[in-house]
Structures are given as C-alpha cells and as structure tokens.
Amino acid sequence: MDTNKVAIIGAGPAGLTVARSLKLLNIPFQIYEKHSEVGGIWDITNAGTPMYQSAHFISSKTMSGHLGFPMPDDYPDYPSRIQIHQYIQNFAQVNGLYEHIRFNTKIKEVVFKDGLWQVQPEGAAPVSYRWLVCASGSLWDPNRPRLKGEEQFEGEVMHAVKYKNSDYFRNKRVLVVGAGNSGVDIACDAAFMAQQAFISMRRGYHFVPKHIFGIPADVFAHKTGGGPMWLSQWVFGKMLRLLTGNLTRLGLQKPDHSVMSSHPIMNSQLLHYLQHGDVIAKRDIDHLTKNEVVFKDGSTEEVDLIILATGYKYSIPYLDKAFFEWKSNRPQLYLKMFNPQNPTLFASGYLETNGGIYGMLDQMAYLIAKSVEAQLHQPALAKQIIAHTQQPPANLGGAIKFVSSDRHTGYVDKDTYLKALKKFRKKWGWESLESVLARTNQPKLSATKTASEEAIV
C-alpha cells in the first residue's frame, strides 16, 4: 500500500480547505469524518455540536468567504447557520472532495510508528499515512466549571453546548453565564421566550453593532483602517461610545480594556433587550443557594435554569497530548499549524482571531500542502522549512495588546497573521494560492437547500 498520503481528521472548513490545496497540488489524501456530512459544527444534527437554531455568522459574508469561492450574492450580510452549512457543502462539492471522505468514521486513536501515522478507525483496520493533519475542531469539548453551592441548587445547570432552541426557556427564569457571542445570542433568545432573562458577566465589554452606518462592521473597519493601531483603537472607541452610549446605564460594567483588545462581541440585539428590561445584566456569580443565585455584588435572583456559555477546551482526543506542547490549553504550533516536534504532523483551525477565519484557513491549508509537497519532492528545501518552523513563534497579535485571559493566550490579529503567512510563503518562493486558483478556473455554485437541512431541531 502506498503510504505517501495525507490523513486529514475532520471534514469541517479546516479539513476541507487542506483537502482542496492538496488536490490542487496532486497530493493524495484521505479525509475521515465521524459524522454523516461535511460541515462540522455547522450541522445542527451532529451530536455534540454547539450549534443552536438562531445562530448566524458574526463576520459578514463579504469578509468571510473562501478564496476563489465567495458566498452567494443572495446571502444576507450575516448568513444563518443553515446557509453557512449549505455553503460548506457546496465548497466540498465544487472542489470534488466528497469522494475523498470516509463518513461515519470515528477515529479511535492515531499512533506514530516507524515514521508513519497509523490511523485507527473504530471497528476497522488501521491505515498508515506519512502525514497527519488534525482538523477536527476546537469547539467540541465544553469547558464546564462547577459553581459554588451547585450541589444544593434545585434548578437546572447546563452548558450551552446542549442548548438548541428557545422553546426550552418557556415560563422559566433563565440566567446565561458568559458574554461571548454565543452567550449574548442565547440571552437574546431567552429575552422573548423566558419569564425573565438575566446575563452574568465577569467584566465589561465593548459591544460592536453588526452594521455601522448601514455597512457590515468588518467591512467598515476594513475600508476605514490602515492607520496606526493606537489611532484606530482611539477612533473606533470614540465612535462606539457615540453609537451605543454609556453602557453602565444598562447595568453593564465599564470595560477595563481598549476596544479591539478582546474578542469582539458582535451583537446589535442585546442592548435593545437590556434597554427594555427583557434581559437584566448581573455581575459574576458568587454562589448558589437552594433556589437563588447570589452575585458578587450581593444581589440575588431566583432562577430556574442556568446556561453556562463558558466556552470550550482545545482537545485532540485521538492523539496523545505528548505530540504537542500545550500552553493554557492551546497546542503550541509555529504559525498555528506547524508542529516543531514532528514535521509530518500539522494542525488547522486551532486558533482564535478577530476576523473572518475562512480565508485564513485557505492560506494555512495552502502552506501545509506546499510543505508536504516539499517533503515529497524537494528534500533539501523541506529540511530548510523544518528548521525554520522549529524557531520560537512570532508575535501574531500585532500592535494590539490583548487582555490577559486563557482565551486570549496566543490570540491572533487577522491582518498580522495574514502578513506572516505571506512572508513565510515568499521566503520559499512559492506561488500564491490566489494565482493557483485563478489558473484552475473553478466553477461556482449558488447555495441550494440540501436534504440534511430539512431536519431542523
């Protein structure tokens, strides 16, 4: 059996982009997907997905599409989860990737033996590959903290991963813990369905409306940016205060950081619900009693249901953790994809950033594929690349000083990151992905409803 192939674990956007680039370079590969369709978390029917019925993209279609495959013109500025899933399916179809995917195949483990990666699917014989790409996603392992006094609380406490639709909130007093984008979305769902909705936040945040002067916020930032970061932060901060006003009036805390220094909260609805009392802002939780939540400011609320929108832990369950160096629950990878310990092991999608990620995944995938190509056909060049990727990682946050938190450890500024990828590509004299795609002249499909979207939770 020819082992000069690449095993890709995961048929979500990260895995599919790697597959496209490998196919462009005529490098054989096999994708393993534990579910029955492509799309990863965007398929709400997948067990364990954090997706919920009301979810939409938080970056605009204009700034979020794959290179060479823009989102359809008839999509709204912020596509729904159904539209994003259709878009991913069409990406796989147009690029001829379905025939390379083994669906309903969960990987039990992957071991490295005699210079090869032995991929062990559940209920099947192991298969050996020369290269391995981990692209199984970072939103499958819930971070579920225990609340003080939870054992005596008679209400329900659950992680947001189990939340699917707002019917569950009917006639309940609901507290959402966490102000990430999922947390504020869920609080907005609770606003019109629950008896009363609350949201608990540890700190103050900057809320970015999805449209600024009628333009998607990320498009506006792209068109008006380009100056020094300190100036952009100052100007954007002033503008946000003009647009949203003094948020402490609504019970929110004043942010302790500059705008752009934390993951953006892209939401135009929560402030509306706070203004109308449909959602009430609360401080961090101190402890629970039998039927109340006691907050750190001493206030209390009777609550029936607590939703913990407390994020997810990075995990690669099929691979021994020793294959990566981990810091603050993040695998330490050069340019977020190259493993300094083993040049035949790559990862894609294990990063958090402040912009649309699909174009970033495209560029990452192309560099992974070109590195594999060098190992396959240009050993002298491959040796140089391997030595280069073993150096300490560069600062990918750019001029932004991100807040000190586990989530922001190794956080990536999109523009800084794309410049670093371009510099890496040009160092080895590689043609750009854009040029390669232009030569292939790929057809484009409009998103159409597929059978898997008929089942709505």
Predicted regions and their residues:
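Flavin (primarily FAD) cofactor-binding/catalytic cores of flavoenzymes
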Residues: D2-F57, P70-S182, C188-Y205, K210-H211, ...
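Extracytosolic helix-loop segments that constitute the early lumenal/periplasmic catalytic or substrate-binding loops
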Residues: L67
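Terminal hydrophobic/aromatic helix or amphipathic segment near a protein terminus
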Residues: A217-M229
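Active-site-proximal substrate-binding core of FAD-dependent oxidoreductases
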Residues: V208-H211, E373-K401
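Active-site segment of extracytoplasmic enzymes that catalyze sulfate/phosphate-ester chemistry
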Residues: M63-S64
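Short, surface-exposed amphipathic charged segments that create phosphate/polyanion-binding patches used
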Residues: G214
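C-terminal catalytic domain of Rieske-type non-heme iron oxygenases
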Residues: M266-N267, I400-V403
